């Protein structure tokens, strides 16, 4: 029955890891990153769950005759913010899958 002790220990470790992962995911919602474009003329703030929570456009970049430029800057800043969220999630959650060969996981 020696193997049962190892199995119980493994189950406890898995439960702890699951609890730690849930806590880390919960913490992500409180973390924010800021993506920028155009020399910080446009900033987009996102939380760790990829929700865009703020868009800041500096007044001097607003040109009614060039709306397309603002759209491009907002798009670039949003993509920058989402890339930073991916990096944040990877650094926070990657430790849970470290050493496991699980493609597509963090």
UniProtKB/Swiss-Prot annotation:
One Gene Ontology molecular-function label: DNA binding
Stored SUPFAM superfamilies: YbaB-like (SSF82607)
Key words of the record: Cytoplasm, DNA-binding
Family named by the database record: Belongs to the YbaB/EbfC family.
Function noted in UniProt: Binds to DNA and alters its conformation. May be involved in regulation of gene expression, nucleoid organization and DNA protection.
PANTHER family xref list: NUCLEOID-ASSOCIATED PROTEIN YBAB
Protein name per the record: Nucleoid-associated protein Exig_0019
Species, as recorded: Exiguobacterium sibiricum (strain DSM 17290 / CCUG 55495 / CIP 109462 / JCM 13490 / 255-15)
Higher taxonomy: Bacteria, Bacillati, Bacillota, Bacilli, Bacillales
